[in-house]
Amino acid sequence: MQFEISQSTSNISESDGTSAVLEILHRIWEEVETGNLNQKRVNLEQLLQHAPAEWFHPGTNHDLKTKRYQELRDICTQVILLLIKQTKISLASCHESDAGDYKYKEHASLAYSAMSLVKLLLSKLSPIQKGKLSEDIMRGNAVRSCDTHAEHVEVCASSASNGCQVGYQDAEQRLPRLNKVFRDSQECRSQDVSMQSSPVVSQEMESHFSIRPKGIGLFGSLPPGITEEGSERTTIEGESEEQFECSDRLLRDVMKATVGPSIVLCASHAQKHPWTNKASLQAANALLNQLTSTCGCNSLPTLLSGCHSDTKRNDGVNTKRLIPKGAFRLAMVELKQQLTRNDWKKYPAAKHTFAWLLAHLKHPYVGDQLDHCLPPSLLFVDDYEMENKVLGIQCLRHIIDNVDPTELRWYGRAEVIYEALHPLLYNHKPDLIDILFPCLLAILKVIEKDPKKTDQPRKLGRYDKALQIILNNMEGEQRILVRQANARHLPSFIDVMGITILWHMKRLIRIIIAYLETSDGPEETGRLLTLRILQAVILQAWPRMMTHCSDLMKSLLKLLLDISRGPTDISPEVRDTVGKECIECMTLLKRCCGTVVEDTVTKLLDSNLEDKLVKDCLENVLKS
């Protein structure tokens, strides 16, 4: 079905291109409301594409009225919001019914159609460049000047008929589906005897002409009686300024009302999810680019945080005040109703949308939005599902990294974050451990003083409490993946705590020796991680290494023998890596304990060792 705007559907007898635009937008509204968006998307896009951009700017009409501007502004805003609303309803129905692939595919197709139409409409609303506006007006008035056309001819007809003007055929070239607007307008004006003006026929380039009502320019009505060159230039400049200011005003009003919901729609389709497909991902990216450029921003983080540039774009739009406080707050107003404590699980897309938006908000603007960022993040962390816990910790880590520590300590926010993370230390899920430990360490740096500072007597603090829980978990853990996850992040705690690690030395050494004695597969991941723990302990607690040197040397030598004589499925690369890490540990012990390590290594080399790997490692220790 192809849509045409005719006299029967729109009162265009007293209107111009803006009336055609209003008719197009009303038709889109009707089709979206009836649920025919997917079926009629192509036709609706063609209607928008073929409409000249000048028709979307009331400022291009000489007889601009406030009512006309408000009508265009309201219908543009309502169409965009209705498109977004339909996608929200569709996605909510998918979640409620636990939809399968078919339902999600249908929603993805609907979202693609909605985002494509929103992008196209916003591109039409973007202000036209001033230079282009002047050229268009001059082209519309050029048919009245005899000095610039050698073959310009004027023919006068009966004064009772309505005047008409011959000019370019841009209407049919630019809008094939809406050319009936011009014909209907001409017929209506020819029947209007109130004008009582003589027809004027202008012929240009002999074979290239069309007819339009007198006084109606190609993109709107022109001031009557412009014949002198000087007055024509003055009108062009004044009308160009009026056109541009009105176009800018229209864009600002529409964007302020729709940028938040539009960004939320894009964010929900910015990553791969069950409710997205390749087309919706591309449409979301395209719409985000359109929103960014329309608001005068050079990147998405700038759009979310606010446009603070004093410069102007090529089309002259002042970008400083378009979205001065950023679109993140507007997007959160849209998301807030879906992220309440009782209802947020009904909208699985909302949590991913929030996380995506937060990830693109950078320092120092995250601090300004803490009231919007912190509650949803804590809500996710407190949930019993592992996926939501991980997502919440990721959000908290981004907040910690992008907010000044002093600002986090205001009103006890850092304490709240720590209290939310601390109970998770008792969890034994590898995926959670990998993301929890770095986040916990980051918040401890905010709320606790540096343990390495010696300005006052040291006391057990929250670093020590967290480490005690970690060591308790490690000491009795038998699951390989959990052991590896704990061992992977323990060196970070040791490096931060420094010499205060001495309070936990006995348990640490006991865990290190136990982990070195246990193989966890051909890759020996657990042993390699344990060797790095030992290196961190030696570096931070070197004054006490003499006490534990003998036990550690025995454990390292056993490890070398086990690797050299172990299963054949251990690759040479793994053997070499383990050997290098053992050499590093023995070298550090030698520097701490002096001749004790050297004497032990020398005695072993003099005993005619048969294992080449052990012998090479010991020789390297003496040389280092």
Residue ranges of predicted features:
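Alpha-solenoid helical-repeat scaffold
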Residues: 2-134, 238-294, 479-624
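Alpha-solenoid helical repeat scaffolds
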Residues: 247-258, 273-376, 385, 390-391, ...
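Non-membrane alpha-helical secondary structure
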Residues: 17, 64, 68, 72, ...
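Charge-rich, low-complexity intrinsically disordered regions
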Residues: 2-7, 11-25, 34, 57, ...
